[in-house]
């Protein structure tokens, strides 16, 4: 795979490969409080980790969730109860016991707009060797 775009601030990348692989479908629906979600990732280095939870709230680009998100899980998909991707897990808060994901709107806006500015900072750019 090659890096097409990279967002260092949010620890996210868009990769491309010449191989045909199965892909997850993106949801057309916004999440709401109580919505069931599943987070996939590599929690604490354990590849293929899954955690289940619910949406606590949805605010702009942030989805607040009850799923356990630990080191290595960031960048993994947040899946709804129909199997569609609704976000990308991005942070955890151990003390408050809630975690977060970036909504697809927030992620896709940056992915599609290389010059997109978020909070006054240009975050996405073409990756150059």
Label for each model-derived stretch:
Residues 16, 41-44, 59, 73, ...:
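Sec/Tat-exported extracytoplasmic proteins
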Residues 1-40, 45-49, 62-67, 117-120:
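Conserved active-site neighborhood of the chymotrypsin/trypsin-like protease fold
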Residues 68-89:
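Catalytic nucleophile loop of clan PA
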Residues 54-61:
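Short proline/glycine- and basic residue-enriched helix-capping loop/turn segments at helix->loop/beta transitions
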Residues 45-53, 95-98:
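Short, Lys/Arg- and Gly-enriched loop/turn segments at beta-strand edges
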Residues 1-3, 55, 78:
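Conserved hydrophobic positions within beta-strands
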Residues 1-3, 23, 85-129:
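C-terminal cap/linker of serine protease catalytic domains
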């Amino acid at each position: 795979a090659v890096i097409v775009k990279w967002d260092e601030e949010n620890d996210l990348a868009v990769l491309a490969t010449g191989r045909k692989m199965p892909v997850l479908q993106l949801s057309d629906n916004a999440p709401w409080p109580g919505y069931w979600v599943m987070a996939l990732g590599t929690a604490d280095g354990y590849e293929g980790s899954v955690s289940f939870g619910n949406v606590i709230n949805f605010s702009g680009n942030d989805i607040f969730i009850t799923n356990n998100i630990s080191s290595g899980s960031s960048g993994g998909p947040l899946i709804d109860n129909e199997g569609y991707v609704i976000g990308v897990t991005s942070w955890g808060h151990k003390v408050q016991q809630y975690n977060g994901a970036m909504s697809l709107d927030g992620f896709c806006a940056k992915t599609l707009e290389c010059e997109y500015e978020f909070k006054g900072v240009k975050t996405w750019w073409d990756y150059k060797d």
